[in-house]
Design a protein with these regions (language model features):
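N-terminal non-catalytic cap/leader segment that marks the start of a structured domain
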Residues: 2-78, 276, 283
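A short glycine-rich, His/Asp/Glu-containing loop-to-beta-strand
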Residues: 11-44, 51, 140-190
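Glycine- and acidic-residue-biased ligand/ion/polar-headgroup-sensing regions
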Residues: 48-75, 93, 166, 178-224, ...
């Protein structure tokens, strides 16, 4: 069995790959981080035959992009100190572009990639362009920011962020997106976690449906900077009391369709209760 959680990955200056099809069950997604510790530090990269999404976790930078037909500069982007300080700034990059990141302070950036034939231009998704949703109810209520969704004509990638208040659940009721049906499409997923304060933790259970040919049921200890690979199965998350939990989520598959998932039938009844609970708690 291949590894599904990656922790204590040393962050080097420049790009550090964390998960990819080479070291996991993933078929499409590669995820890593760019770290530039000092102002004026630079990193140069290229997308090749993949599309990419750059997520500024914290710090400020400029990003220069060169395609076959144009040059684009996104100057002084990223305003939050860390992921808990506001909405994200993300940049979508199509295949076959070169890009350069120039730090204007210490900066940390998530890099999500997947094979693509997209002809979309590069796109800057600013904090004010992000779709914000309050999802769930009671102790499974959380905030979800969708940055790379229908607003961007990517071929495969869907990218956003989720924030769990202390003690709260997310990806709940448990859902999955691992088979083709009228309501579900197969999408693999990667979660990258941050915890506030950083000595805190959360837990994630990943478990398959009864009809899965290779069933598994695992629980992972989520600590700051942990990365979890979700090849299939239900995958709920909970934050420990006293600690905020954040995760970047990255989805990719043959068909790109956000929200095409199915709930665990044992727990799906909770979704029907959410409007009632939210109405009661409003008073």
């Amino acid at each position: 069995m291949m590894k599904r959680i990656f922790k204590n990955v040393k962050l080097e200056k420049g790009y550090t790959c964390i998960v990819s099809p080479k070291n996991s069950e993933l078929k499409y997604i590669e995820f890593g981080r760019v770290f530039l510790p000092e102002k004026n530090d630079e990193y140069a990269g290229e997308t090749g035959n993949r599309e990419a999404v750059l997520t500024i976790f914290g710090g400020k930078c400029s990003i220069q992009v060169e395609t076959a037909t144009q040059k684009v500069s996104y100057n002084s982007i990223g305003y939050r100190r860390d992921v808990f300080s506001g909405r994200p700034t993300m940049v979508y990059l199509p295949p076959n572009v070169e890009y350069r990141i120039i730090a204007e302070s210490q900066v940390e950036i998530g890099v999500s990639m997947a094979p693509s034939n997209s002809s979309s231009p590069p796109i800057l998704v600013k904090p004010e362009d992000v779709m914000e949703s309050q999802v769930g109810a009671w102790n499974w209520k959380r905030t979800v920011y969708t940055s790379i969704g229908e607003n961007v004509k990517a071929q495969r990638l869907l990218v956003g962020e989720t924030f769990n208040p202390p003690g709260n659940w997310s990806s709940y009721p448990p859902h999955k997106h691992d088979r083709k049906s009228p309501s579900e499409v197969p999408l693999e997923e990667v979660y990258f976690f941050k915890v506030k304060p950083p000595n805190g933790f959360g837990l994630q259970r990943i478990y398959t449906s009864p009809e899965d040919e290779e069933p598994f049921d695992e629980i992972f200890l989520l600590e700051n900077d942990a990365t979890v690979v979700i090849p299939r199965g239900y995958h709920p998350v909970v934050a420990a009391p006293g600690y905020q939990l954040y995760y970047l989520w990255v989805l990719a598959g043959e068909e790109r369709k956000y929200g095409a998932w199915s709930d665990d039938p044992n727990h799906g009844w909770l979704r029907n209760c959410e409007p009632i609970i939210n109405e009661v708690l409003r008073f």
